[in-house]
Structures are given as structure tokens and as C-alpha cells.
């Protein structure tokens, strides 16, 4: 597996422009096969999104690395992840900052991710079963918010839970999706289009 990880990192992520050594180290250290069904473990270090049940997926390693890099994290960044999913993106974030807050609307995924993170000795994460569209007001404001499912429009609650100069990285759209980075400056928000992407939809309101 170490050879597969090294190959992924050295030949693919770096070729794709990922430069943050801390992010590359986090991905290198984490056993991605633990976050996916055992039957798919042979694909763990390929650059593919993979199903994790409940109609959800684990993002491809490049997208995990790219979205994380766009957050411009420091060790003391207050981070919110919307969409815990398998917990893989959560674990990458947890290697980079002192504490991660993560919301998941599907209870079984939230529970499984919480259990797995503990098995991997990752304890600097708070998880919540809730509606990601609303953010996590009691933990706000955030230096960085990462959304791992595509919203039809940008949730206002997430914008106003950002700190000044904070970044929101979010896929937007339905059939055609774009990855955006939104930066707050006072009461204004500035948006950059990063690239085209494909994510499962961010479902508002409904908990499962």
C-alpha cells in the first residue's frame, strides 16, 4: 500500500499542482482503504470517487487535496466541514488543524465516521448529526468552511458564519457544477471559480 500511496502522491497529486507538503503528508499517512467498503479496497489509492453507502461517495484524492489547499489553513484555524461522509476528508483536516467541526445529515454515516476516527486515534474532531445548510452557529465564526456536496445555491447561513477573510470552499450547481472559493471581507463576499467538478447533492432540511 505504501508504494501505491507514494505513486499517487508523487506521480499524480504533484503533477496536478498540489504543493502543500502538510496536505500531502496527511494523505500519505491516512489509510484510505479504511474509509471505503472492503470490496473496493483495491481501488483505495486510485484517483476515483467511490461509493460509501446511503447514496454518498468518498471524493477522489485530488479533490480532497485541492479543496483543502484552497482553505489556506493554519494550525489554529477554526474549521467547519459540511458532509462528514466516510470521515476521510475530516481526517485530512484533523491532521492539519487543532480541531475540526463536522456535520452529517445521515446518522449512520456520522456514527461510522466517528467510530473510525477514534480507531485511528484521531480525537480532535467534533461531529454533529444535523442540517449542513444551517452550518453550526454555536461553533462559529469559522476561518474555513468546506462543503463536500453540491448545493443549488450558496447557503446564506454558511456565508455569515465565516470570519472576516475566511474562506468557504463549495461545489455549486446541479447537472453542471463548479467548485467555488468564497472569501469574506467585512460584509462583502468575493467568489472565485476554481474548476468544474461532480459531487452528490447537498440536501437541505432532511435528516436521515
From Swiss-Prot:
| Gene3D superfamilies per record | Vaccinia Virus protein VP39
Write down the chemical reaction(s) this protein catalyses.
[protein]-L-isoaspartate + S-adenosyl-L-methionine = [protein]-L-isoaspartate alpha-methyl ester + S-adenosyl-L-homocysteine
Keyword Transmembrane found: no
SUPFAM superfamilies in the cross-refs: S-adenosyl-L-methionine-dependent methyltransferases (SSF53335)
Q: Which Pfam families match?
A: PCMT (PF01135)
- This entry's Enzyme Commission designation comes to 2.1.1.77
Name a single GO biological process: protein repair
Chief location: cytoplasm
Report the GO molecular function annotations: protein-L-isoaspartate (D-aspartate) O-methyltransferase activity
Where is this chain's protein located in or outside the cell?
A: Cytoplasm
Cytoplasm: present as a keyword of the record?
yes
Instruction: Please list the residues that make up the active site.
Output: 59
Q: Which UniProt keywords apply?
A: Cytoplasm, Methyltransferase, S-adenosyl-L-methionine, Transferase
Q: What's a single GO CC term here? A: cytoplasm
- Which NCBIfam families does the record match to this protein? pimt, PRK00312.1
What role is this protein assigned?
Catalyzes the methyl esterification of L-isoaspartyl residues in peptides and proteins that result from spontaneous decomposition of normal L-aspartyl and L-asparaginyl residues. It plays a role in the repair and/or degradation of damaged proteins.
Q: Which family does it belong to?
A: Belongs to the methyltransferase superfamily. L-isoaspartyl/D-aspartyl protein methyltransferase family.
By its UniProt entry, which PANTHER family does this protein fall under?
PROTEIN-L-ISOASPARTATE O-METHYLTRANSFERASE, PROTEIN-L-ISOASPARTATE(D-ASPARTATE) O-METHYLTRANSFERASE
Name of the featured protein: Protein-L-isoaspartate O-methyltransferase
| Organism (species) | Aliivibrio fischeri (strain ATCC 700601 / ES114)
Amino acid at each position: 500500500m505504501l508504494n501505491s500511496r507514494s505513486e499517487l502522491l508523487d506521480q499524480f497529486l504533484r503533477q496536478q499542482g498540489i504543493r502543500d507538503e502538510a496536505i500531502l503528508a496527511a494523505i500519505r499517512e491516512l489509510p484510505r482503504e479504511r474509509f471505503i467498503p472492503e470490496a473496493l479496497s483495491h481501488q483505495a489509492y486510485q484517483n476515483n470517487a467511490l461509493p460509501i453507502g446511503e447514496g454518498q461517495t468518498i471524493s477522489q484524492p485530488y479533490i480532497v487535496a485541492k479543496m483543502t489547499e484552497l482553505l489556506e489553513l493554519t494550525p489554529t484555524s477554526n474549521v467547519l466541514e459540511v458532509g462528514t461522509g466516510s470521515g476521510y476528508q475530516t481526517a485530512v483536516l484533523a491532521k492539519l488543524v487543532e480541531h475540526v467541526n463536522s456535520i452529517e445529515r445521515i446518522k449512520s454515516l456520522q456514527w461510522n465516521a466517528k467510530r473510525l476516527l477514534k480507531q485511528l486515534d484521531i480525537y480532535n474532531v467534533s461531529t454533529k448529526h444535523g442540517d449542513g445548510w444551517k452550518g453550526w452557529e454555536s461553533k462559529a465564526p469559522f476561518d474555513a468552511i468546506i462543503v463536500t456536496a453540491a448545493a443549488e445555491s450558496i447557503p446564506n447561513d454558511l456565508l455569515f458564519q465565516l470570519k472576516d477573510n475566511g474562506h468557504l470552499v463549495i461545489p455549486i450547481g446541479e447537472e453542471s457544477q463548479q467548485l467555488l472559493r468564497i472569501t469574506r471581507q467585512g460584509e462583502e463576499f468575493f467568489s472565485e471559480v476554481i474548476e468544474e467538478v461532480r459531487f452528490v447533492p447537498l440536501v437541505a432540511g432532511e435528516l436521515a
